[in-house]
């Protein structure tokens, strides 16, 4: 039996849920959470390789700008499940994962009521009691496989990348549940994070070229698709903006990360940018805050609807945030990822306060790119307002 052992330490509050969402699994860290982010990033890397080869173009629907076609979904699933070994659940072709993973807590862990710990948690839980774990708990992640196969190291590299750029549990895209990689045994060859991402991408590109015909990937003959139909790790740009971007703001330390995390709470964003909890920031002025994720639709006490509304009930944020300390194998700071893709509703309805009329927004590739630019500019201004963000490592592209 081959084995990789990774020691992890959570750097931010961990809300993993259990058999009921407001309780916390007494083991602290669930294998299903790790498997979930591993598969998500594997799809992103394989999807990026397909997209860059002109093999992932998507199809438009009545409601959504772009979705991957049924054949594209199946192709990605097979490449991830069979070649990367993460398992496949397609009728008549199902295959168990070649990896077995399990997690062991390395210290005593006791769930606590987390509702008042961070501003974001209180918003997620609507001020109701929810169990979680404070930072600094240690876990051992064991990854086992019975026999070697061609792309096993590629899959393991993607796992390490997932642990760098994504947290686990509730609020994971906003930095909750971030996990330092404290040690890796046996140690992979020493490499920095930029090299690790590039190696994983190059190996996925080789995999895609090798198995294009095997799994039915077909070029539409159109390499000028503006956006991929799902978030992918791609080398391409659209309107001179990277389709995928990964950065590390190295000067964000523990005492500042909660402030960075609070960018996604509008009142806190306004406090930093305009010294007031109420403001018309650029995301508000340009009606671009939908880019932070849908739904953004709430009701005031008068029951008047405010925010963004779409026929599609949910669209997760394309922005991911994670935090690591100097104990992390790949360095410390705020790790930020942003993906541009076409899987947005074609129409979003914006509702302001009682003085403003609702407005219908038409979403196309240009609108997605423009919304990203508004977000990016405002986020950098916000970091400057916190006096951080001056030491930046560009990881990808």
Regions found by a protein language model. Give the residues of each.
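Basic, Gly/Ser/Thr-rich N-terminal segments that form RNA-phosphate-binding interfaces in CRISPR RAMP
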Residues: 1-397
